[in-house]
C-alpha cells in the first residue's frame, strides 16, 4: 500500500487522487485564480524573494534579527499617489535607498517635492596646496585651518572615479568650499577637473586676485559637462566675516 502523503479532491461524485505525489517534494504550482493569504503572512527565507516568469530576480528580502521596523506600500484612489512608507515600532523611522558601486544612482523621474535636505560635508584641519574635491563624497568641504599659500582645487568623482565617468553629457554638479585666512590673503588660483586645468567663468566677470584676510572665503563651483571631458565651470568667491 502507498503510504505517501497526497492531495485528494472531490469532483462532486468521486474522491480523486490528484497524483501530485509527496508534499515534501518541490513543486512550482500554477494558479488559475488569485491567491488569498487569509489575513496571514507569507514567510520568505533570508536572501530569497520574487522572480519573474523567466526566473530572473526581481525583489530580494533580507532578514534582520528582532526587526521592529518595515516598509508599508499603499495604493491610491484616482487623483492620488501610491505611498511607500517606513513604519514600525520606533518613533522615528527613516528610509534608506542604497545604490551599488560609486556610480550607482537613485533616479527620480518627474517632479520632485523635497521638504528638507541634509548634505554630507567634510571638515579638514590639514591645508592642501592641491585639494582633491571628491564630488561623490560630499557637497560641502570645510578646510578648517588657515591657508598657507594659494591653492589648486581639482574637481573629481573620487580617487578611483573620474568626474567624466560620474557625469553624463548635459549634467552638472555644484560644490561649495570653505577656506580660512588669518592675516593672509591666499586664494584659489587654479581650478582643475580630473587633473586638467580649466578656465572658469567667475561671478562678477573677473577671477579673484586674492583672498580676504581674517575671513572665511566660500567658493562655489558648478561644473556642466558639455561633451566628453569638456566642462563649463561657473565659480564664485564670497567673503564671510
Task: Please report, for each region that a protein language model flagged, where it lies by residue.
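Short, surface-exposed beta-edge/turn micro-motifs
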Residues: 4-5, 46-47, 92-94, 137-138, ...
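Exposed extracellular interaction/assembly regions and N-terminal maturation sites
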Residues: 32-36, 41-43, 56, 63-77, ...
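Short structured motifs
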Residues: 81, 159-161, 203-207
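Short, low-complexity N-terminal tether/leader segments at secretion or assembly junctions of large
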Residues: 2-24, 38, 219-227, 231-241
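Terminal beta-strand-rich extracellular "head" domains
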Residues: 194-213
Amino acid at each position: 500500500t502507498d503510504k505517501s502523503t497526497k492531495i485528494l479532491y472531490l469532483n462532486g461524485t468521486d474522491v480523486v487522487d490528484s497524483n501530485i505525489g509527496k508534499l515534501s517534494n518541490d513543486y512550482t504550482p500554477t494558479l488559475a485564480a488569485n491567491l488569498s493569504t487569509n489575513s496571514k503572512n507569507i514567510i520568505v527565507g533570508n536572501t530569497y524573494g520574487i522572480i519573474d516568469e523567466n526566473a530572473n530576480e526581481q525583489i530580494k528580502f533580507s532578514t534582520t534579527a528582532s526587526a521592529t521596523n518595515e516598509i508599508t506600500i499603499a495604493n491610491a484612489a484616482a487623483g492620488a499617489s501610491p505611498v511607500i512608507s517606513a513604519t514600525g515600532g520606533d518613533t522615528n523611522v527613516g528610509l534608506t535607498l542604497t545604490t551599488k558601486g560609486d556610480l550607482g544612482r537613485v533616479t527620480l523621474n518627474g517632479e520632485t517635492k523635497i521638504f528638507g535636505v541634509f548634505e554630507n560635508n567634510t571638515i579638514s584641519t590639514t591645508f592642501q596646496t592641491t585639494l582633491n574635491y571628491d564630488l561623490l563624497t560630499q557637497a560641502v568641504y570645510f578646510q578648517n585651518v588657515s591657508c598657507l599659500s594659494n591653492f589648486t582645487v581639482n574637481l573629481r568623482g573620487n580617487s578611483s572615479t573620474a568626474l567624466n565617468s560620474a557625469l553624463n553629457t548635459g549634467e552638472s554638479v555644484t560644490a561649495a568650499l570653505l577656506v580660512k585666512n588669518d592675516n593672509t590673503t591666499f586664494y584659489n588660483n587654479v581650478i582643475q577637473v580630473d587633473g586638467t586645468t580649466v578656465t572658469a567663468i567667475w561671478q562678477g566677470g573677473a577671477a579673484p586676485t586674492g583672498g580676504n584676510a581674517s575671513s572665511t572665503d566660500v567658493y562655489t563651483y558648478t561644473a556642466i559637462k558639455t561633451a566628453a571631458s569638456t566642462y563649463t565651470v561657473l565659480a564664485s568667491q564670497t567673503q564671510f566675516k
